[in-house]
From Swiss-Prot:
Residue intervals of the bHLH domain: 173-225
Reported function: Transcription factor that regulates the development of the g2 pharyngeal gland cells and pharyngeal gland function and thereby is required for feeding. Required for the expression of a number of genes in the pharyngeal gland, possibly by binding to the E box motif (5'-CANNTG-3') in the promoter region of these genes. Positively regulates the expression of genes encoding mucin-like proteins, which lubricate the pharyngeal tract to ensure efficient passage of the bacterial food source. Exhibits pharyngeal gland-specific positive autoregulation activity.
InterPro entries: bHLH_dom, E-box_TF_Regulators, HLH_DNA-bd_sf
Alphabetized Pfam families for the sequence: HLH
This protein's encoding gene: hlh-6
Any GO molecular function: DNA-binding transcription factor activity, RNA polymerase II-specific
Polar residues bias: start-end ranges: 131-140
GO cellular component, one term: cell projection
UniProtKB keywords: Activator, DNA-binding, Nucleus, Transcription, Transcription regulation
Amino acid composition bias (Low complexity), ranges on this chain: 117-130
Protein name as it appears in the record: Helix-loop-helix protein 6
SUPFAM superfamilies: HLH, helix-loop-helix DNA-binding domain (SSF47459)
GO biological process: nematode pharyngeal gland morphogenesis; nematode pharynx development; positive regulation of DNA-binding transcription factor activity; positive regulation of eating behavior; positive regulation of nematode pharynx morphogenesis; positive regulation of transcription by RNA polymerase II
């Protein structure tokens, strides 16, 4: 079934073309509205003329309704403003060129890339917008390229406090000073326990006793000296050190007479 150009323009008063990546709308102004012969329409026309009066008016109404049904619907979104001049694309002579655009002439890769690049390009700072400062740019670059230290690397070594202070600020040096003060405190406590052991009633050849036993023995020895100041006969009936062997962690030999021996050695 062949369709002539006049019938095609009558059926489709608006055509669309796609050339060089651009959609264009063509409005066919010189359309020849010729009714399409239809057996059903002819039968209805004969029936109306024979049976119903005023057939001329009804026939015109039917023809207009049929023509409205045959015209394709146009969306309201494609409204062409009348204020701007209408630029009509040249109408091709062949119907095939209207229905099937030349695909070989359409750029496949160039056109979408240009559109995407135009969308992705950031806006350049104008005179009204403030330019980013150099300090902010340096901060962002330092955060982006932060140095990562692998703790499991074989070449990893403990840095010196001076190096830590240079890299991470003065906070690392304060931590190092705090650790140094803690070590000094532990050293002083150990020296105090050593001086306290020298005053206890234990021989110097005795093995070193623990800190807990040192404190327990010091408490009992202070009680013994207090009772001895009250009564000189307390040393003959002293029970201050009873049960110390059961509480102590090791077998410690206690001799009250060794106090004079320790004091004489300290005086020497």
């Amino acid at each position: 079934m062949s369709i002539s150009q006049n019938n095609f323009l009558t059926m489709f008063p608006v055509t669309y073309t796609f050339e060089n990546g651009v959609y264009s709308t063509i409005i066919n102004q010189n359309t020849i509205q010729t009714p399409i012969p239809n057996p059903i329409q002819h039968h209805i026309q004969n029936h109306i003329q024979t049976s119903i009066p005023n057939t001329n008016l009804l026939l015109e109404n039917v023809q207009t309704d049929v023509q409205k049904l045959m015209v394709p619907l146009i969306d309201q979104q494609f409204h062409i403003p009348t204020s701007t001049p209408l630029q009509l694309a040249p109408i091709p002579t062949q119907i095939q060129s209207q229905l099937q655009p030349q695909i070989s002439q359409i750029p496949i890769h160039n056109q979408p890339q240009i559109q995407i690049q135009s969308q992705v390009q950031p806006q350049l700072p104008t005179q009204s917008q403030p330019k980013p400062s150099s300090k902010a740019s340096l901060d962002t670059s330092s955060n982006a390229f932060k140095k990562y230290v692998n703790p499991f690397a074989p070449e990893a070594t403990v840095p010196l406090p001076v190096e830590l202070e240079d890299q991470y600020g003065p906070y690392s040096s304060s931590v190092w000073k705090r650790n140094e003060r803690e070590r000094c405190r532990v050293r002083n406590v150990n020296d105090g326990y050593e001086r306290l052991r020298k005053h206890l009633p234990v021989h110097f050849d005795e093995k070193r006793i623990s800190k807990v036993d040192t404190l327990r023995l010091a408490i009992r020895y202070i009680k013994h000296l207090d009772n001895l100041l009250r009564s000189e006969l307390h040393q003959y009936n002293c029970k201050c050190f009873n049960g110390f062997q059961e509480e102590s962690e090791g077998n410690i030999l206690i001799d009250i007479s060794t106090f004079n021996f320790n004091s004489s050695n300290n005086a020497m």
